[in-house]
Amino acid sequence: MKALLAEATWTPKKQNLNKNLGVVGSLAWKDPQFKIVDKSFPVLRHDEVLVRVKYCGVCGSDIHVYETDKQGYILFSGPTKLPVVLGHELSGEIVEVGNEVKGFCQGDIITTESILWCGHCTACRTGMPNQCENVGLLGLTVDGGFAEYITLKAKYCWKLNHLQERYSFEEVCKIGTLIEPIGCAYNGIFISGNGFLPGAFAIVYGVGAIGLGAVMLLKAAGAAIVIAVDSIE
């Protein structure tokens, strides 16, 4: 199958060799290259679903794997394991389910979480999976959605079938790619930020996908005035 692969040269910065920070992309990976490759078809495990990818959004994180600083190191500063198939804002259709998977079946339209939490560490057990001590990142530490097919653990997947009551298959899949960035906005406003009282004024700095999602969420939750600010290039 075809996939977009990101590669780079493993060159940890000298000042960080003894700090156990090598997994941080901007401290370790240099001279990135992107290329279309033929990859082996993914092998389905017992707790996974096989998904035919329909759409996958391009996140700023993906761009920061390509962009570099003056020394040639990638700009992305989170966990990174290269080479990897990029892409985490994806949607698609399930074509096969593992023999231990419940709640999903062939033909389901799904999207997925991008933070791959373990479910066992202290952070996960206390309801903070985005702080997982064993976290993986879809499309950054494991192969992501810029491919024809992908296998995903069922526990990370969310069904979108109910949206077909109002939207076409194509439209539902497009909506599915926006759930991850809008979920980031939701987490920032209502989980980390503890929400706000109806009638409040709000300012959003930056109106990319996450910022626009924040604007919509703020308006839906009762903000009286929402001001969006961005730079003009």
Indicate residue ranges for each PLM-predicted region.
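Short structural boundary motif marking the start of a folded domain
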Residues: 1-4
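Charged, glycine/proline-rich intrinsically disordered loops and linkers
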Residues: 7-35, 71-77, 166-170
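Glycine-rich beta-strand-centered segment in the early N-terminal region that forms part
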Residues: 33, 40-57, 71-122, 164
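Short Gly/aromatic-enriched secondary-structure transition segments
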Residues: 65-71
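NAD(P)H dinucleotide-binding glycine-rich loop of Rossmann-like/cofactor-binding domains
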Residues: 77-83, 88, 118-201, 205
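Adenosine-nucleotide cofactor-binding segment
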Residues: 168-169, 198, 204-207, 215, ...
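Hydrophobic/small residue at the entry helix of a nucleotide-binding pocket
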Residues: 184, 210, 218
